[in-house]
Regions:
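Bacterial N-terminal signal peptides that target proteins for export
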Residues: 7-31, 568
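C-terminal segment of classical bacterial N-terminal signal peptides
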Residues: 37-46
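Classical Sec-dependent N-terminal signal peptides that target proteins to the secretory pathway
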Residues: 32-36
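N-terminal prepro-regions of secreted/extracellular proteins
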Residues: 46, 560, 565-566, 590-593
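Signature for phosphate-centric chemistry
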Residues: 48-174, 180-420, 424-548
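A cross-kingdom C-terminal cell-surface attachment/processing module
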Residues: 567-590
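Ala/Thr-enriched low-complexity intrinsically disordered regions
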Residues: 2, 9-10, 17, 547-548, ...
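Extracellular Ser/Thr-rich, low-complexity/disordered mucin-like segments
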Residues: 549-573
Length: 593
């Protein structure tokens, strides 16, 4: 493929699968070995909840193991690679803005003045940790990829090149790379292309396709009035505003969840290792114990900017003065947000700005799970399967699915674009996963305007949705497409291309109702995919070589009834465990305003 070469040196320790360790002529052999390695189904192990760190959507990406890759099913005999396409969340990042660190700093100042820390030493260390994580984010850039994020996407690019070596060997094939336009998404694409071996390829901003949830684009422009993209974003924003405002069902559900006795108990339990009982009880009781993200912590004061930051170069280093801590639950959740983002900042957590927020959760593992639940609830309701009988939160991703099919159709029609790589956000992946009915994204919550019990809301016991599984950092959905030359005797027309899916680089079946080409196969005819995912008519059998009349009335995938089991049989990715240990390295940093 034009432009494919070896990745540039980054100063990082080489990945065992790095293209730098594979001779150009051996890529085809490598891909063939992978293809022939196994025909069994890929079933990633389910992790034990007791070993999890409960990082919610801040879970660092876990690269596929050799066993995961070896489990990829080869294409049926006679079929060869035609195209590949991806949509991926950005990789691990630092804090998205000067918010959690600032809010806890304002709270800590009050605690220090009132003797609210258990001991002066605990207070000194707590504030030092806050100062350190702020300094690390100022140096790295708020919202920018961390070293882990760069490594995650470089590795993904390397594996994509190895898996599709035969496709990329054709110099007549082109690659298209697209970004939402947000800096961290663009950085992710750049690092992916570095791993792929095409670092000079420019990324095309596509906020219409990859930032569909907002009218305002990442660069400050707005989607053009009167366009479908603008209308879709306006409808989504209006729906979420109505649902999360007073009287909204989502607002009622999240309020019920946050006010569950367990929320208060675990928050006070966590904070009791740092603050006195009296200070915890005072949180939110009056204006002096309510903190805003401002220069003095008071409501209505000016925004604050992180010490040492250049707001012109890093506007996210300045606060949103509306953010606040109004209760012990707010304070604990703010601390939890620093704990989980620290897992994505291992290479930045070095002198002179070392920090340790994990210490506050030692012995509080079940509390961390509860905080993950609280954080997951918001994403589930606003971006995921949400409420039974509603699809507004994920139908907004329909243009992305349409684009996946467009890429295939264009290629089948003779186009030269053989690979399309898209880089976006959790706000892209979560609704796309629900639209595709991917594992864990199949069960909505009850549509109850006034929840009276846990049975009326999203709950871990009855719903499989987990942010750490659905949308970890660098989460991705990849489709590989294969084709076969000649005429299919079963149809008298050209052979229909086949598609298989990787979810976070583990091969999985398409949703229930999408019929594969053979029993036990993960490969599906593109016509069958269109039928089961979009309702398009289908005039051929979903099976290879089957001349029997097709029944295109078989229903496609639907969201399961609310409640129910945990979808464990189909949820093969398991709880993703933190498995990072990359050495600190020198790296290229690209900052964008």
């Amino acid at each position: 493929m034009a432009g494919i070469g070896h990745p540039q040196a980054t100063g990082r320790s080489p990945d065992p699968t790095s293209l730098d360790r594979v001779k150009p002529g051996s890529l085809l052999t490598y891909a063939a070995v992978l293809a022939a390695a196994s025909t069994f189904l890929a079933v990633p192990a389910q992790a034990d909840d007791t070993d999890a760190d409960f990082y919610s959507s801040k879970q660092p990406y876990i690269a596929p193991t050799d066993a995961d890759i070896a489990a990829y099913q080869p294409a049926p005999a006679g079929y060869s690679p035609l195209a590949t396409e991806t949509v991926a969340r950005h990789g691990s990042r630092g804090l998205s803005g000067y918010k959690y660190d600032l809010l806890l700093h304002r709270l800590a100042e009050t605690a220090q003045a009132e003797g609210g820390f258990l001991t002066p030493e605990i207070g000194t260390e707590f504030i030092a940790n806050l100062d350190a994580i702020t300094a690390a984010n100022v140096e790295n850039g708020y919202g920018m990829l961390t070293g882990q994020g760069e490594t995650q996407h470089q590795g993904m690019g390397e594996r994509a090149a190895a898996r599709n070596a035969a496709l990329f060997a054709d110099a007549g094939n082109r690659i298209v790379a697209e970004t939402s336009g947000e800096s961290r998404a663009t950085e992710s694409g750049e690092n992916f292309l570095l791993g792929l071996g095409d670092a000079d390829l420019a990324l095309e901003p596509r906020p219409d396709l990859l930032y569909f949830h907002k009218v305002e684009n990442p660069d400050g422009t707005e989607k053009a009035p009167g366009t479908p993209e603008r209308e879709r974003a306006e409808a989504y924003e209006a729906y979420i505003e109505a649902q999360t405002d007073d009287g909204g069902t989502i607002a009622a559900a999240t309020e019920f969840i946050e006010e569950r006795p367990e929320s208060v108990r675990v928050s006070e339990e966590l904070l009791s290792g740092i603050f006195t009982a009296e200070f915890i009880a005072a949180m939110g009781a009056d204006a002096a114990h309510t903190w805003y993200a401002t220069v003095d912590g008071a409501k209505g004061s000016a925004p604050a900017c992180a010490p040492g930051a250049d707001p012109a170069a890093d506007p996210d280093a300045c606060s949103d003065p509306k953010k606040s801590i109004k209760s012990a639950v707010d304070a604990a959740m703010t601390l939890y947000n620093l704990y989980i983002i620290a897992a994505d900042m291992e290479e930045e957590n070095v002198a002179p700005h070392e920090f340790d927020f994990a210490q506050y959760f030692d012995g509080h593992e079940t509390d961390a799970e509860w905080f993950a639940y609280l954080l997951d609830a918001e994403d589930f309701y606003e971006k995921g399967p949400s409420l039974a009988g509603h699809d507004e939160t994920y139908a907004v991703a329909q243009p992305l699915l349409d684009d996946f099919f467009r890429v295939i159709d264009d290629r089948v029609a003779g186009g030269d674009v053989a690979a399309t790589f898209r880089f976006a956000h959790a706000e892209t992946i979560v609704p796309f996963a629900a639209l595709l009915k991917l594992p864990g994204s199949t069960v909505p919550a009850p549509d109850v305007a006034a929840p009276a019990s846990v049975d009326d809301v999203f709950d871990y016991a009855s719903n499989p949705w987990r942010g750490s599984q659905v949308t970890p950092m660098a989460a991705n959905v990849q489709w590989d497409v294969v084709s076969r030359a000649g005429v299919d005797p079963a149809t008298g027309a050209a052979y229909t291309p086949l598609v298989r899916m990787l979810y976070n680089e583990r091969e999985i079946a398409f949703a229930d109702g999408c019929r594969p080409v053979a029993e036990g196969s993960h490969w599906v005819k593109v016509t069958e995919l269109k039928r089961c995912l979009t309702g398009a008519a289908m005039a051929e059998s979903p099976l290879i070589g089957d001349t029997a009349p097709v029944d295109d009335t078989v229903p496609g995938p639907e969201l399961a009834a609310t409640g129910g089991g945990t979808d464990a049989a189909t949820w093969g990715l398991g709880i993703l465990l933190l498995a990072v240990g990359a050495a600190a390295v020198s790296r290229r940093r690209v900052f964008r305003d």
